[in-house]
Amino acid sequence: MAPAILAVINGYLQEKGLSLRQGTIVDATIIHAPSSTRNKDGERDPEMHQTKKGNQYFFGMKAHIGADVESGLVHHVHGTAANVADVTQVAELLHGEENAVYADAGYTGVEKREEHENREVIWQIAARRSTYSKLNKRSLLYKAKRKIEYCKAQTRAKVEHPFRVIKRQFGYVKVRFRGLMKNTAQLTTLFALSNLWMARKRLMGLGELRT
């Protein structure tokens, strides 16, 4: 049901010209699960896992999304345990019509993975700073690389909007159920609603919404 809701909303938004489907930005965020919540046998949710991000440990799941490069609207949602590597889930987030895929440095090497062997897209993955930090900062090559990375970052920033909407506007910061299936279904519905939220001003401009 949840994927169908997302598909219907996105079909409507695409009809209104709000999703061009020329490129996809992929990203993921951790959704916390209460580590103290246990079932009647005293066990934590076996589908949730612990992961380390920076110097902090988190317990829960990950929401992986694919978003339109122009509008930032979400077209694919995939849920996994928190310890699953982001780069392994990209195939679940693409609609197949994009000509470019944008992602942060955590997705380095994605283009070499077997599942993307015949995928004809331009991979716009953020370069790790270490790949150009040793260059002379006054050189044209360094300045060009910095400018390219800045442009990539501006594009990737759009994928943060739906995460912010579900966490701040909708107050979704922790999983509500046990297991990945139910929580992924709820996340998919929330991202579908976040698309309407993010497109509301443009829809009002088209006379599609009334205040």
PLM regions and their residue ranges:
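Residue-level marker of positions within ordered structural domains that often coincide
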Residues: 70, 171, 197
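Helix-centered, glycine/charged polyanion-binding patches within enzymatic domains
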Residues: 99-100, 105-185
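Acidic, contiguous segments within the catalytic cores of piggyBac-derived transposases
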Residues: 143-147, 152-153, 190, 197, ...
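Polybasic low-complexity intrinsically disordered regions
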Residues: 1-122, 128, 188-194, 202, ...
